[in-house]
Amino acid sequence: MNNLKVYVTSIIFLFLSSAIHSSEIGNKMKITGEFQVKLQPLDSYAKGAEGINLGRMSLDKTFSGALDATSKGEMLSAMTSTKGSAGYVAIEQVVGSLSGKKGSFVLQHFGTMNRGKDRLILEVVPDSGTGELTGLSGKMLIKIESGKHFYEFEYELSTK
């Protein structure tokens, strides 16, 4: 189980390729900040076969900056026997404040790595915003620099 935790942590670090600030782009806002992440192995339903390693982890984050929030979620991952090829999906609910507006929203992750070349899609689930974050849409980028995690979040709050 400990090897699985190291493996999944390695996948996340490989996927996640700044100072805190906020800027407006049309109706969209763009903020950056730092976050801490804690991953813990969970019992898996499915077991990998024929060189595939499947994993399931809990995901706990604390965001700082214009996104002052915590999140909880789950991640599923698959690592192939080919070095640098893997994939993961995750769902996390973020609860707190975004640029002073309180509420929650859900982020969905989809990441693949093809022999070391990574691709990550991290978006707000449509209609998942609550409270003052109702109508939230957006995309998040994640970077790791010198062992620290940073986010860049471009979002929009519609009044529809």
Model-derived features: where do they sit?
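Targeting-peptide/extracellular-domain and disordered-appendage signature
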Residues: 4-6, 14-160
